[in-house]
Amino acid sequence: MASNPNAVEQEILQAVNSAQTTDKRKAHEQSLAYLPVEEERGVNVVGSKMKPRYIALTCDDVTRIFYIHRLKVNDKGGMTVVKSWPLFELQNITVINDHDVTMTINKPHLLRTQDTSARDRFVFSVAKNYMYYMGRPLSVTTTDGRKVDWAYRNSFADNKPNLYPAKSLAIPKARSSLPENSSEQVSSSFNSRVAHNRNFSDGPIVTNLETDQPRIEKKLTIDSSRSAKKKLSVEKERRFSDNKPSSNVSRGTPSSAHSDVIEISSSSAIARTSGDRKDDVLFDTSTQRRDNQTREMFIQEQAQLFPSKPSLRKTTRREQAPSFNSGTSSSERGKNSISGSYEKNTALALEAGKYNMSQKDVKLSSSLESNTFASDFSKVDRDATQAALSSSLETPSVLTSSYKPSSSSKVSAKSVSRKPTGAPAIPKLPPKHPSRQPTVRATPSTGKQIEPPNDEPSIGNELLPLFESLRFENRKTTSKPKAKKTLVTSIPTKPHQASVEKVYDLNSKINLKNIPEQSISRLSTLKWNEGTTIKDVLKQTEFSFDGAIISSVENLAEEEIELQNIKSQLQDCALGCESINSTINLFSLELSTALNGVINIEQQPSRR
């Protein structure tokens, strides 16, 4: 190997720049560091197991890409590039001992050096430029997996290698140590956090919006809270025992009793809490006075704006009860909870009474309105209206059924004046059979027919809007009985109609009068025998239909057989085409061999 470092560097640069890159251009690379190493030979190579090589780290001036090159020394002089890798393919470096190191690029490459300091400088340069190029530190470890400290620290300041001066950057330390005053900063920050910590079990901090300072609240200890709970339970039992006789005596007037209880409980609670506030809590009286003034001003403005509307009960209750947000402590909240519960129960009872009274007023007003609105229908029989509503849901054939006339309906004078002068008669449905024709009466004076009366009670004319689809005729009954005339209607006979009628009457309940004219004309054209029925006709049609289907299926089967035959013929044609193709290929091969033989025969005398 060459001993002059500058000469070695020049040879490396010349070899690297003369090598063709992937884009077929001359490289313009600068050498950053190089290391003479001995690399293992292959297993099948006879002779020395190690071969001399150079490992160089370079950077291209144009593309700004870092490379790792492996070079070998030629026998005639100079160097050639054996293998090149971009720096980002380098995975890690493992330091085995003072002489051996492994670089993993897709696979581990064992490199042996005689100069340990040169090896260390090269590894440091690679790690430094890897950090600059990739933005993350390179893994340089020992065989045990421990990090190599000298690969991350600039401990080679006196003997710097040939680094690239333009882009050399300081590598940040992998294990950054804390500054000298770090413990003081940590302790001060911890103390500041502890100073701002607060136990939020008593509730959030209530701040004054004017001064933006937290109000002073006295924290209760666990023992004091337990004693306060015991006192509250004792006072609650005593209050219940004191209030029981007063509530029993004043059952007749519950509202007055509840009001007395409210006044007594609230006054006693305020008296007790006012004595405890001086010792337990220190609060700002100016803010409380200001809140009371604003509340009073709001009540006055409300009274001026709404003079007729009484003041709400909730506002009065809020005025009597002490406000918790204005500076009361948790002990006062517990003491005032009993009086607040009494006030809530009594207020709910009073509001329930008011609601019942308001419901009664609403019922009275609605009843008065209904009386004034429905004064015309006060004399209408309810049973008659219900029967009419039920009859409206039935089929219209009910109207044609015979029944006995009922008594005249009770209708007011106003409803009679609103009765229409006349309405067209309802179209009658045809009966099921000519023998079931109903009897129809006709008056001698007027030739109009009168329908038979209905069994349902008569309906007032004021309910006519409910039966817009059903229209009634003005009925005029006479006191004297008159002779009844039966009118029998019949349909004119057509050819073969009697036989058709017999067939339908035997096998179904269908009436010929309900069948459309087109179907009747179609049936009349058919040739019916005396003993034939619809079932026989259906059987005949089914038999003919089945025969047609069977014939069509047979035709389809025959066509399918023909298609299969055609398919087999096509397959035979394809096989014949393939055989023809193969024979053509054989002929072409024979021709080519024959031509080659002819050409060889012609060339032999020329060579001789």
UniProtKB/Swiss-Prot annotation:
SMART domains: Sec3-PIP2_bind. GO terms for biological process: endocytosis; exocytosis; vesicle tethering involved in exocytosis. Residues 212-221, 232-242 have a biased composition (Basic and acidic residues). Pfam families: Sec3-PIP2_bind (PF15277), Sec3_C_2 (PF15278). Residues 176-192, 396-420 have a biased composition (Low complexity). Residues 243-262, 322-340, 436-448 have a biased composition (Polar residues). Residues 175-262, 302-340, 389-461 are annotated as: Disordered. InterPro entries: Sec3-PIP2_bind, Sec3_C_2. GO terms for cellular component: cell cortex of cell tip; cell cortex of growing cell tip; cell division site; cell tip; cytosol; division septum; exocyst. It comes from Schizosaccharomyces pombe (strain 972 / ATCC 24843) (Fission yeast). This is Uncharacterized protein C17G8.12. One of its GO terms (molecular function) is phosphatidylinositol-4,5-bisphosphate binding. Transmembrane segments: none annotated.
